[in-house]
């Protein structure tokens, strides 16, 4: 059957059966008849459905969606790469989007879980794919969104809830650090982190210039991160509320005074226009989240 698409380009479809009552010839795969396919195409054309666009793969659709927004944070870019790589290594990635049903999307989620992906990661990926398929609906490529379902209906949320330390637990931990031969050198940094409530990347990004000791205020307008590919880099807050001035408590102020007094010599490093970072490792380079993750794990193990 030959038909002309809305842009004037001829398209062809084939079937080994003319009408539904015809038998499938020996050696041929069972398929709907040509007349049924013809009826589907006529309905799609009448409804303005892009039958050609519906043949793009899930990978192509996700790439098209990503190309709609280029100005993104590096963490978002890395997340996109991870999802694209997972799609390329999964049967779903090469499927035409007009063939993907909700059962296929649910089977994808189950496969992801079996591969060891965390529930939250799968949920984030599902949200991205749902947005991609929504774009395909808006572009009249498909009618329904196969990712329009609750992940909790398919997988059990096994995410362990974060447990916040009580004030009493904080004090006991700090008392232990203050007298421990190994961890007492981190005491002031942990006090400062707990008192300010900063994100660890904001904490690591603090520079001497961000500190107003006279008015006891911190200026928070950037984060310091480190990547295996590009090394240190600076990120700015996603929203205006991320930029703020933070007043120091008396305890934070006292800890900061000791930190400045005991601070080693910084290497002449400039990252994204920022230098003279407050928290340094033994080489005089800025500490990053990974340094504190390792330290805190060791501390907790010894404390417990």
Please place each PLM-identified region on the residue numbering.
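N-terminal DNA-binding module of tyrosine recombinases/phage integrases
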Residues: 4-106, 261-273
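N-terminal core-binding DNA-recognition domain of tyrosine site-specific recombinases/integrases
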Residues: 25-30, 66-141, 159, 181-182, ...
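Generic recognition of well-ordered alpha-helical segments
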Residues: 36-39, 82-86, 107, 127, ...
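Conserved hydrophobic/aromatic pocket- or pore-lining residues that grip, position, or stack substrates
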Residues: 62, 105, 129, 140, ...
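Phosphate-coordinating loops and pocket residues in cytosolic domains that bind phosphorylated ligands
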Residues: 63, 102, 114, 175, ...
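Short, basic (Lys/Arg/His-rich) helix/loop patches that form interaction surfaces
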Residues: 119, 175-186, 246, 262-277, ...
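Basic, Lys/Arg- and aromatic-enriched nucleic-acid-binding interface segment
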Residues: 125, 138, 142-206, 214, ...
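Conserved tyrosine-mediated DNA breakage-rejoining catalytic core shared by Y-recombinases
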Residues: 205-264
